[in-house]
Amino acid sequence: SYRIEDNSFNSFIPSYSGTNGAIATHSNLSSITAYNILNDDKGNAFDAAAGAMLVEGLVNPQMFGMGGEGVMILKPKDQSPLVLNGNTISPKKFNFLNLVTRGYTEVPDEGILCAGVPAAFSSIFRMLQLYGKLDFRTISKYAKEYAKEGYPLHTGITVSYTHLTLPTKA
């Protein structure tokens, strides 16, 4: 969802600006979550990013999901930027020697032999383990509340599913 048009007419994707930081998410619910984690819960930017990602995965599953990827570029204070690669991880019992004995010189591009375990969720946990300040219960409470109480459905979801036919009882 890359936007180049003016979004000032669209209340679903508001523009936020300030003098003490910035929050950029696709959903306003994710931005509000990040804001609350920073201000109400006294978390840091990594806590806010994790909370926003959890909400985004819930309210915008067509854009990001826990069963997917979570690559992050992080900039801890007084450290060089680093990349946390949350694409996929190899299954626990994966052994490259098994591929070699089958005649492969590298992991194939398609098929079961190249399957990886989705790592978005584990990359969020790793980021919090390294740089987070708050506990996971505090960070995840906003996503949990939206999941329990409901949230406005994004039009991208409804448009994506209008072509599907639901089964009917005979």
Q: Each predicted region: which residue ranges?
A:
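A short, hydrophobic C-terminal helix/tail in secreted or cell-surface proteins
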Residues: 165-170
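Noncatalytic scaffold domains of N-terminal-nucleophile
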Residues: 2-40, 45-164
